[in-house]
Design a protein with these regions (language model features):
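Metallo-beta-lactamase
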Residues: 2-5, 99-148, 194-200
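Active-site metal-binding motif and surrounding structural segment of the metallo-beta-lactamase
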Residues: 40, 51-98
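Active-site neighborhood of phospho(di)ester-bond hydrolases with catalytic His/Asp-centered motifs
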Residues: 45-47, 69-77, 97-100, 159-162, ...
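Short acidic active-site motifs
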Residues: 84, 283-287
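FMN-binding flavodoxin-like domain, especially the glycine-rich phosphate-binding loop
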Residues: 171-213, 217-220, 262-277, 287-385
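Short, charged N-terminal beta->alpha structural module
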Residues: 248-270
């Protein structure tokens, strides 16, 4: 596939995978992207998951038309992008591997048989001339691994962005919801903890004239790139994407669920955009993404072993691990003799910045009654705007 006259796509699609990184459900599969520049010298960007090594090598060969790969640029050492390196080098022993010092440290951790005499170490700001194409190396540490770097082709104005601007889903599957939905779930799940580091990279990118973004997952981005850059700026600064309420609940016998659904119906009747998640059954990553997407969050859970229900603890820890902040939060707790869920949740959220806790949090003892229904109605009023 042509990206520009000299840049070709040589990646693969994975429809065998069910869980990406062992935890994220990917019903539309995944893409492992790899790119090739054909100039006086040739440059290959990143490899693919080892299960698709042969397909990838065939893709490269068909584009080279008998030429060799001069440079193999390693932007990210995570195995879905690096596990085919050794097999490539066995077939191409004269290719120079380009990476930074941390790249090669990780290379030696993963593999024992990549020779040292074919390595070229680059530093931030270094350039590599291929002929008419000049590559500039932009370091992006902790987006989302420490060795990550991006590469800017100043000739075709293409940013090879590593995992940044990636999304879930194979590239041969039409996404009816567009780029942003699965890109948000991908960003928040995988990169979300590192907002400060993403902000630093966005500042570097602002100084570049970028016409195309080539990420390691998802489609090649062209056209009005401000759409994607603005969303990344919003996500990495932890600003809500939309006005609305995410309601996440756990329930043992249905009483806490009844309260959560009652609140949802009241908010819906007031014209509020809502999404409701049963944390024991629904996709946890979808619930986490919704908590970051909306400006309001309701946590409804039972007291369990003097703590909170395990799925709720898991959910809240997902939020805090990703620096959850700048939101309004309400709590609905339930406990038949000693409801302590609110206290536990507030303790878990203690380190989060700029959270506003609702005035009308609800404490249920066993089941809703007239008094708690009234408090629930007050919470609906409070969270309606």
């Amino acid at each position: 596939m042509f990206i520009t006259n000299d840049i070709r796509y040589v990646g693969v699609n994975d429809h065998e995978i069910d869980l990406f990184e062992g935890q994220y459900v990917v019903p539309a599969g995944m893409a492992y992207n790899s790119y090739l520049i054909l100039d006086r010298k040739t440059a290959l960007f990143d490899s693919v998951d080892i299960r698709f090594r042969d397909e990838w090598l065939n893709n490269i060969s068909s584009e080279l038309n008998g030429r060799k790969v001069d440079y193999f640029i390693i932007q990210h050492m995570e195995p879905d992008h690096s596990s085919s390196i050794v097999e490539f080098m066995k077939a191409n022993p004269d290719t120079v591997i380009v990476g930074n010092a941390k790249t090669f440290a990780m290379l030696d951790q993963f593999f024992e048989d990549v020779p040292a005499n074919v390595r070229q170490t680059v530093k931030a700001g270094d350039t590599l001339e291929l002929g008419t194409h000049v590559l500039n190396f932009v370091f992006a540490p902790m987006v989302h691994w420490p060795e990550v770097m991006m590469t800017y082709d100043s000739t075709d104005k293409v940013l090879f962005s590593a995992d940044a601007f990636g999304k879930f889903g194979a590239n041969d599957v039409e996404d009816p919801e567009g780029w942003a939905c699965e890109a948000a779930r991908y960003y928040i799940g995988i990169v979300g903890k590192y907002g400060t580091q993403v902000q630093n990279v966005l500042k570097k990118a602002a100084a570049l004239d970028i016409k195309t973004i080539c990420a390691l997952h998802g489609p090649v981005l062209t056209g009005d790139l401000n759409t994607y850059l603005d969303l990344y700026n919003k996500w990495s600064s932890y600003e809500p994407d939309k006005n609305g309420v995410a309601i996440a609940y756990t329930s043992v016998y249905g009483h806490t669920k009844a309260a959560a659904l009652s609140l949802a119906e009241q908010l819906k009747a007031k014209g509020v955009k809502i999404e409701v998640f049963d944390l024991a059954r629904d996709d946890m990553a979808e619930a986490v993404e919704a908590a970051f997407r909306f400006d309001r969050l309701v946590l409804a859970t039972t007291t369990y072993n003097a703590d909170i229900f395990p799925f709720m603890r898991h959910f809240v820890e997902h939020l805090t691990e990703r620096n959850f902040q700048k939101r309004r939060v309400a709590i609905i707790e339930n406990g038949s003799w000693a409801p302590t869920a609110k206290k536990v949740i507030l303790g878990l959220l203690e380190g989060c910045k700029d959270l506003t806790i609702a005035e009308n949090c609800v404490t249920i003892k066993s089941a809703l009654n007239a008094e708690t229904r009234e408090t629930l109605a007050k919470l609906a009023e409070e969270f309606a705007c």
